[in-house]
Each structure stands twice: as structure tokens, then as C-alpha cells.
Amino acid sequence: MRHLQRLYDDLVAASQNKPGLLGKLFGKKDQAPVRGLYFWGGVGRGKTYLVDTFFEALPFKEKTRTHFHRFMKRVHEEMKTLGGEKNPLTIIARRFSDESRVICFDEFFVSDITDAMILGTLMEELFKNGVTLVATSNIVPDGLYKDGLQRARFLPAIALIKQNTEIVNVDSGVDYRLRHLEQAELFHFPLDEAAQESLRKSSRALTPESTAGVETD
């Protein structure tokens, strides 16, 4: 939790030093982003829970919480609308930075060559615009897109992640989903609404890292 507390404090401090109206008008928005966090480790280690709790606690509205692949789907959709632009990723990154100071990605995982080829430029532009990245992943940054086609072109994205986030391994040897089952009520009678809610609660606890959608607040 100390990593999240550090980031929270840094973001709050940075919010008190945001550029004023003149700075925005004259394009002085570019600033070094607050260094984010990249949580990686096995399934069931509580990564998503930590980030969800952190996201809800942030005391400002310019924030986004989304599954990584949903985010990339939006990027590709916006690129289609900017087909005539010379630097579409610069424009897209500016749009994201206008919406959010912090972007929280769940399940950061790269398998698509198209995503791999554009992520370096996209991340460079996001960080240039002061966006802070918080991500969860099952894979350490150096293992992303391993053995992928033209992986050398993806390496700048890995370097940017390592430069702009604190890498935190959350493997503790404890699967918190299984711990929940050990404490859960396994026999339900009668089969009423309370029993149904108990089952729903156990289901949510078992699959927290696959239930997140897009949240902007």
C-alpha cells in the first residue's frame, strides 16, 4: 500500500501546481508526469482490487479506469477517423490527456502486432502530455510481447513503462480468491435471495480481474 500512498500524495501535490489558463492557451500543458505504478504478478494476488480502491480514492474527476484491450479498441477506432492526419497518435494522446490525468489499465497484455507497433509512440505522447499510468499485469514489463513479431519495435514501449512507472511485484504466494472460498458459506438453505446474493459475492471474489469495465469519474 505504501506504493499507492506515494502515488496518491504525488498526484495530489501535482494537482495544486496545474498550469493555469494562459499555460493551456499557449500549449504549456506538457510536463513530466507523476511516476505511476505497474503491478505484476500471478492471478488472484489482489492487483485489481488495489487499483480499484486507489482509483475510487483519487480526489479529482480527470481519471479513467479501463481494461487495456478496451482502451486499445478505442485507439484503433479513433485512428480510423484520423486517416488523413500525419500524426494521429499525437492527436489521440492529446484527447486522452484532456480527459484524464491518470489512466488505470487492468490486464496490460500485448499479443497483437498492430498494438505492439503503435504503443511506443502512443505512450511517448501520453507521458509527454503529463498522463500518469497505473497498470496491472500478469507479466513483468520485460516479458511483454515476448517472441512477438518485430518485437524490437516494441522495446521502446517497454523502456517507457520502466522509465515512467514503479514496477511492483505482488506475488505473495497467497491466492486471495481461494482464501475467500475458505471463509465463504458453502451450504445454502433455503435457496432464497440471501443465498443468491452469497453466491454472487463469491463469484465476484473469484473473478475480480475479469469484471472491470470502463470508468471515468
Cite the ranges covered by each PLM segment.
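Walker A (P-loop) phosphate-binding loop of P-loop NTPases
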Residues: 44
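Conserved lysine of the Walker
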Residues: 47
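Phosphate-binding P-loop
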Residues: 7-20, 24-34
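Post-Walker A helix-loop "phosphate-sensing" segment adjacent to the P-loop in P-loop NTPases
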Residues: 55-64
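Hydrophobic anchor at the beta1->P-loop junction of P-loop NTPases
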Residues: 39
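Hydrophobic positions on the alpha1 helix immediately C-terminal to the Walker A/P-loop
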Residues: 50, 54, 67
